[in-house]
Amino acid sequence: GYLYHPAYYYGAGASTQFKNQDAIGNYNFGYNEGHATGGTFRREFGDAFGNVKVGSYGLTDADGRRRIVTYKADASGFNANVHTNEPGTDSSKDPANTLVNKAVLPTTYYGGYYPGHYYGHYAPYHYGYY
């Protein structure tokens, strides 16, 4: 396991980003950003004709709170699915046609953000990165 010491991670951070577009115009892009107090990410894939956009974004706080949103935008509109363990969220209420998945908050949190550590995000299959 990892040992966590706040002085060791204070101010430490890392980020990566990517963007690709083929000759037709299909694209994907994304970034990961993390530091001792949390991290954020975003990924998106879209076709050349604007017919569909699929993506996800999210954040993690040092205290263990997480929010991950996966979405699809197409001719049917924008549809989002929110996965979170944040206090005050209620999965029985569906705000603006958005599905909220409330997880149990962790009782103990053992560390900060570790660059390169996997935090439960599943990128759409088209990305080929995970």
UniProtKB/Swiss-Prot annotation:
Mind listing the UniProt keywords for this protein, alphabetically?
Cuticle
A GO CC term assigned to this protein in UniProt: chitin-based extracellular matrix
* UniProt-recorded Gene Ontology molecular function terms: structural constituent of chitin-based larval cuticle
Matching InterPro entries, A to Z?
Answer: CHIT_BIND_RR_consensus, Cuticle_Struct_Prot, Insect_cuticle
Pfam families, alphabetized: Chitin_bind_4
Q: Which residues form the Chitin-binding type R&R domain?
A: 24-90
* PANTHER family (alphabetical): CUTICLE PROTEIN, CUTICULAR PROTEIN 47EF, ISOFORM C-RELATED
The protein depicted here goes by the name Cuticle protein 14 isoform b
